[in-house]
Amino acid sequence: MTSDRNGKLKPRLEAALNALKSVPCVDKQKLGAFGFCIGGLCSLDCARYRFDGIRAVISFHGTLTPIEGIPLELLDDNSIQVHHGDADKHVSKVTVDAFHEEMRARNSDFVFISHGKAMHSFTDPESAGIAPSGVGYDANAEKRSWKATLEFLKEAFA
C-alpha cells in the first residue's frame, strides 16, 4: 500500500475522510488526523494531498518520506506536528532532513519534536515484544508527546 500512495493509499484516505464528514455532528472544516508509524505517514499524506477540512495533522514515529510525483504545493491551510524518536533506526537522518526540506519548500506550519533516546514505536508499551530491532517503548517520550499533542490540538482548533 505504501509503495503506491497515489494509486491505492490516497483513495482509501479520502474514503475515510468522507466517512468522517458524513457524521452529522462533525465540523467538516475543522478536521484533524493523527497516526502512529504507517498511520503517521497517512496523517502526513492527508496534509500533503491538501484534503479539504484538514486543519491539524500529528504523526507519532511515522514514516516521513515525501510522496513521489505530486507537486510541492503550499501547505498553508493546516498545521503539522511530528513526534520522532531520536534513536529511531527506521527513519534515517537523511529522511528526517528531507522531510524538513519538504516542509520548508511547502511553507508549512510544522513542529518537529525529536524525543531523545526514544526508538521507533516509543508510544507502544507492547513494542518490546515486537521482533524488529530498534523498536521500544519510552514512557517519557509517550507522556511528553501526548501532552504536546493536546496543546497543539487546542491551538489548532481554538
From Swiss-Prot:
GO terms for molecular function: hydrolase activity. SUPFAM superfamilies: alpha/beta-Hydrolases. It holds the Pfam family DLH. Coiled coil: none annotated. InterPro entries: AB_hydrolase_fold, Dienelactn_hydro, FrsA_esterase. This is Uncharacterized protein K02A2.1. It comes from Caenorhabditis elegans. The lineage of its organism: Eukaryota, Metazoa, Ecdysozoa, Nematoda, Chromadorea.
